[in-house]
Curated annotation (Swiss-Prot):
Matches recorded under Pfam families: Methyltransf_4 (PF02390)
Keyword Transcription regulation on entry: no
InterPro entries named among the record's database cross-references: SAM-dependent_MTases_sf (IPR029063), tRNA_(Gua-N-7)_MeTrfase_Trmb (IPR003358), tRNA_methyltr_TrmB_bact (IPR055361)
Biological role: Catalyzes the formation of N(7)-methylguanine at position 46 (m7G46) in tRNA.
Catalytic activity: guanosine(46) in tRNA + S-adenosyl-L-methionine = N(7)-methylguanosine(46) in tRNA + S-adenosyl-L-homocysteine
Protein name: tRNA (guanine-N(7)-)-methyltransferase
Length: 239
């Protein structure tokens, strides 16, 4: 596994550019299980970053609908969805190395064959590796809300990001977001409503009930017990 999660960007004169990123790089401490999974399973399930388009059919060994999840955490929900939907292929992106290791280990436990994972900046993967008009769904569950106003620009859901996601979705494909921070949910709605050729799937023009396709995480269950809300937002590409 190549540890090159953050790639540099340069201007035409070769000077490094500072890029505002939506995540904080946290290496964390690996458990033995996570390290073993990275050592043994990354060559089978992991996908190295490269600045060229993926052949998704070749990657999974078949032609099937592809779901992309950005920021899968420890991978519990992603592995569950892959297990419950064997007719679909799942590609997960996560920058937290212990989370990648945990996801790989869980995938092996469940004997999952329709899952591949990457450890790299999702924006660069989308821009350089994901073919246009190819994805059935993009999932973004509980991204960092960057609570402080001065950090709001770091939120991943911004108009250019929404446009980028749209270009990777098939017509009819869906961008599904979820957050437990209401101001971020409102921000997501504002951004998505401002981008052409998306249709909000909410009957009321705001949020949708949690679809059964999105598993409830332990974190979410704990929040529910404490009275915290969760907002699901789903927009379909219509053109």
């Amino acid at each position: 596994m190549i540890n090159n999660v953050i790639s540099p960007e340069f201007d035409e004169n070769g000077r490094a550019l500072r890029r505002v990123r939506s995540f904080v790089r946290r290496q964390g401490r690996l458990t033995n299980r996570q390290q073993q999974a990275l050592d043994n399973l990354w060559p089978k399930i992991g996908v190295e970053y490269q600045a060229e388009k993926l052949e998704l059919g070749a990657l999974f060994g078949r032609e099937a609908p592809v779901v992309l999840e950005i920021g899968f955490g420890m991978g519990a929900s992603l592995v569950t969805m892959a297990s419950q939907n064997p007719e679909k292929d799942f590609l997960g992106i996560e920058v937290h190395v212990p989370g990648v290791g945990a996801c790989l280990a869980s995938a092996e436990d469940e004997n999952i064959g329709n899952l591949r994972v990457m450890c790299h900046d999702a924006i660069e993967v989308l821009e350089n590796m994901i073919p246009d008009n190819r994805l059935e769904m993009v999932q973004l569950f509980f991204p960092d809300p960057w609570h402080k106003v001065r950090h709001n620009k770091r939120r991943i859901v911004q108009p250019p990001f929404a446009e980028l996601i749209k270009s990777k979705l098939k017509v009819g494909g869906v961008f599904h977001m979820a957050t437990d921070w209401q101001p971020y949910a409102e921000h997501m709605l504002e951004v998505m409503n401002g981008v052409d050729n998306y249709l909000n799937l909410s009957e009321n023009g705001d949020y949708v009930p949690r679809p059964s396709s999105r598993p409830i995480t332990k974190f979410e269950l704990r929040g529910q017990r404490l009275g915290h809300g969760v907002w699901d937002i789903m927009f379909k590409r219509i053109k």
